[in-house]
Design a protein with these regions (language model features):
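Long recognition/docking surfaces used for binding and targeting
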Residues: 3-114
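Non-catalytic, well-ordered alpha-helical scaffold segments
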Residues: 1-4, 100-104, 108, 128, ...
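Glycine-rich, flexible loop segments associated with nucleotide phosphate handling
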Residues: 25-34, 102, 174-183, 328-329
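Conserved S-adenosyl-L-methionine
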Residues: 120-230, 238-240, 246, 250, ...
């Protein structure tokens, strides 16, 4: 409903003042007519795509409760929502240069109250600062073609478009080409698809090259014809099983890499467990990925990145269609302390040090500065390794006096505990049977 109202507000012939709660032409009908006009003016097609979008907005027209005047409000709930969204949200999207996924934030907030936040489907929306970090890590340029095969509410595509626009400056030809030809996505869930299309259309991406299809069923060779040089993805989490290994996160990763052009860069955010190869199928995916593509590095993220979900994520970066050299040096970074912190009743917020810590990460990633091994380990990698900083890291720092005292204290506490349990043989060289 929110995305539909925002589309209606973007129609030049639509006015909130025309919403009068009329029993003949309801507010919902007026809004849906405006949505239809806005989709046509943006050349959204084919007709099947436009019809699918309109079906997602049907509740605006069909809900009697939304279209009846409320005595307390003195207007229909639809008019109240429309006025609120115009004042608080629409102008921010339309007239400010922002990479913020406002509609995605609405979706996430509503779902958190519904008792069904999409986790049963593995849906975890990507925070805005992660979308922006992807653009930094992949060094997105105005000439790039971006593909997000699990685009959700289009957060990655919005961030990429914002970055490309900024780099393009006032060149309107380049900016128009970015919107028409250089942003592509797939989304399986029809409600998410509608939100994603709305997000792009409101930012003047008229044709919105997002398809409501299952990415895993697409032929990589055909997707490759889009010419994508950048891949960004937050795939569904924890859906893979022994019975259906195609749903593992690494399956999505391999399919994405196969769908990009040679030399393209891709970044994905997945659970840490995906990097360990904990099942035979996942190990097979890791081997196949290295056989055909190159792992550039893995960044361990803040454990609260997806606050309230309980997933410990990592960002993995790859180069497509270049087999991983055995002597390739990868970077494994511990970025858990990213400057973002959880505040009561608010959630994850940017701390005072976040910008500086992000800049340090990028300086290390691009080789502009060195970092101690506790932050970044540079190492070769194999398919049977755990692609995590914690796997490659060896604490080679000289212990401090406080570290030494703590270690001795821990040992003495352990020894005392064992003696009190009549297990002093552990420290005398005797056997457990001697006690008997």
């Amino acid at each position: 409903m929110v995305s539909g109202i925002l589309l209606a507000l973007d129609d030049q012939f639509f006015s909130v003042d025309n919403l009068k709660g009329d029993g003949i032409t309801t507010d919902g009908q007026l809004i849906c007519e405006a949505i239809q006009r806005r989709l046509k003016s943006s050349n959204v097609g084919p007709d099947a795509k436009r019809d699918k979008l309109m079906s997602e907005f049907a509740i605006i027209r069909t809900s009697a409760r939304l279209n009846e005047k409320d005595e307390k409000l003195g207007k229909t709930p639809l008019k109240f929502y429309t006025e609120f969204l115009k004042e608080r949200v629409f102008d921010s999207i339309k007239y400010k240069s922002s990479a913020e996924d406002f509609i995605g934030r609405f979706y996430g907030e509503f779902m958190s109250y519904s008792g069904g936040d999409g986790q049963s489907l593995g849906i975890i929306l990507t925070p805005a600062h992660i979308c922006e970090l992807f653009c930094d890590l992949l060094d997105v340029q105005p000439t790039d073609i971006v593909l997000d095969p699990c685009c959700g509410t289009a957060g990655f595509l919005v961030a990429a478009m914002h970055r490309m626009d900024y780099a393009a400056g006032d060149d309107q030809t380049v900016r128009k080409n970015i919107r028409k030809k250089q942003l592509h996505g797939f989304e399986l869930q029809s409600n998410m698809f509608a939100i994603a299309c709305t997000n792009m259309i409101l930012r003047e991406d008229g044709n919105s090259n997002i398809q409501c299809q299952d990415f895993l069923k697409q032929n990589p060779a055909l997707v490759q014809q889009k010419g994508a040089t950048i891949g960004m993805m937050n795939p569904p989490y924890s859906q893979g099983t022994k019975a259906d290994p195609s749903q593992y996160e690494l399956s999505f990763v391999e399919h994405l890499l196969d769908s990009l052009v040679k030399g393209a860069k891709a970044a994905v955010i997945v659970p840490q467990s995906s990097m360990t190869g904990k099942t035979k199928d996942e190990q097979h995916f890791k081997e196949s990925i290295m056989m055909h593509h190159t792992l550039e590095g893995v960044i361990t993220c803040n454990t609260d990145t997806f606050y309230g979900v309980g997933t410990n994520p990592v960002i993995a970066v790859f180069t497509a269609h270049e087999p991983h050299p055995t002597d390739k040096i990868c970077k494994f970074i511990d970025f858990r302390n990213d400057g973002y912190e959880v505040r009561a009743h608010i959630g994850l917020v940017e701390g005072d040090s976040a910008k500086d810590k992000k800049q340090h990460l990028l300086d290390v990633w691009f080789g502009r500065t060195e970092a101690p091994s506790k932050f970044c380990v540079e190492s070769t990698a194999q398919a049977d390794d755990e692609w995590l900083h914690s796997f490659y890291y060896f604490n080679d720092e000289i212990p401090t006096e406080a570290d030494f005292e703590k270690a001795i204290g821990d040992y003495l506490s352990f020894e005392f505990s064992m003696i009190m349990q009549n297990r002093e043989y552990l420290f005398t060289g005797g056997a457990a049977n001697d006690e008997a």
